[in-house]
A protein has these predicted regions:
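N-terminal nucleotide/polyanion-binding subdomain common to many enzyme families
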Residues: 1-50, 176-199
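SAM-dependent methyltransferases
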Residues: 158-246
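Internal, active-site/partner-interface "lid" segment
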Residues: 118, 130-169
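Structured adenosyl-cofactor binding patch, chiefly the S-adenosyl-L-methionine
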Residues: 97-143
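Gly/Ser/Thr-rich beta-alpha loop segments that engage phosphate groups in nucleotides
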Residues: 34-37, 68, 90, 94, ...
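S-adenosyl-L-methionine/SAH cofactor-binding core of RNA-modifying enzymes
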Residues: 37-89, 95, 132-133
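Hydrophobic/aromatic beta-strand patches that form the interior of the parallel beta-sheet core
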Residues: 10-12, 58-60, 83-84, 104-106
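Fold-independent oxyanion-binding glycine-rich loops
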Residues: 14, 62-65, 87-90, 109, ...
Length: 246
């Protein structure tokens, strides 16, 4: 995408804007406390030097205290011409930089890392692939979170691996049955790993009536079988809890 000119990026080192020969960019916080803060002067000068800041004025500070980064936010950012990401270090940055420059604070999760560069890389990678021309729209439409649900399981050759066979429906050529199987498996995975997304889809009105009916049949373990004697059809097999002896 970079070679094709679809996207471009630039890296700015705030140490290049420090005032002393040691390129000092941090100091102890007022009021005491552990750790160091990035100094406002070199960071501010670094931001002033960025052409994207001059053009768009859209600056993001990557911090654990920011709003959660989501696929929806990534899609929103992908439509902007340019964005600027501030990568924090140590205990963070001076609040005055946030007040003066920052438009939004974003967090990639409820955990703390040693620096913001890795978090910024996550945001960049998530956003740039949504830019027109980077990845086909069909691939994006079927990914996890693009339709409020996690993506269904994927299989490729060989047909049998370590005794495990690819579900026969996927090679049946019946596109409608394949679609139903994928929706079913997507719902199954979402209910197991991220049930909150189901509720969100209901709230947003993106969960279809077909999906709701499938959810009504799901238990902890659901399998898909292909009836060879009749036309391909979905058969939902509910798991039974084994007698624990209690």
């Amino acid at each position: 995408a970079v070679e094709k000119g679809i996207i471009a990026y630039d890296l700015v080192n705030i140490r290049d804007f420090a005032f002393d020969r040691h390129h000092t960019c941090d100091d102890a916080p007022y009021g005491g406390g552990a750790g160091q803060l990035l100094l406002p002067e070199p960071l501010g000068l670094a931001l002033d030097s960025v052409e994207a800041y001059k053009k768009t004025k859209h600056v993001i500070y990557v911090t654990p205290s920011g709003k959660p980064f989501t696929q929806k936010k990534a899609q929103e950012l992908s439509r902007k011409d340019e964005i600027v990401l501030i990568c924090g270090r140590y205990e963070g940055i001076d609040q005055r930089i946030i007040d003066y420059y920052v438009d939004e604070e974003i967090s990639i999760g409820d955990y703390v890392m040693s620096s913001g560069e890795v978090a910024a890389t996550v945001i960049v990678d998530t956003v740039y692939r949504l830019v027109d021309g980077v990845i086909t729209s069909e691939s994006l439409d079927e990914e996890s979170f693009s339709g409020s649900l996690l993506e269904y399981p994927q299989y490729t050759r060989p047909n049998v691996y370590k005794g495990m066979e690819v579900p026969s429906v996927l090679s049946s050529g019946n596109h409608e049955e394949i679609r139903k199987w994928r929706l079913f498996k997507s719902l199954q995975k979402t209910l197991r790993n991220r049930p909150d997304l189901i509720q969100k889809a209901r709230t947003d009105g993106t969960l279809t009536e077909e999906a709701e009916k499938m959810i009504g049949t799901l238990t902890d373990f659901v399998t898909y079988k292909n009836d060879r004697k009749q036309k391909s059809k979905l058969r939902y097999v509910q798991s039974r809890t084994k007698d624990s002896g209690k």
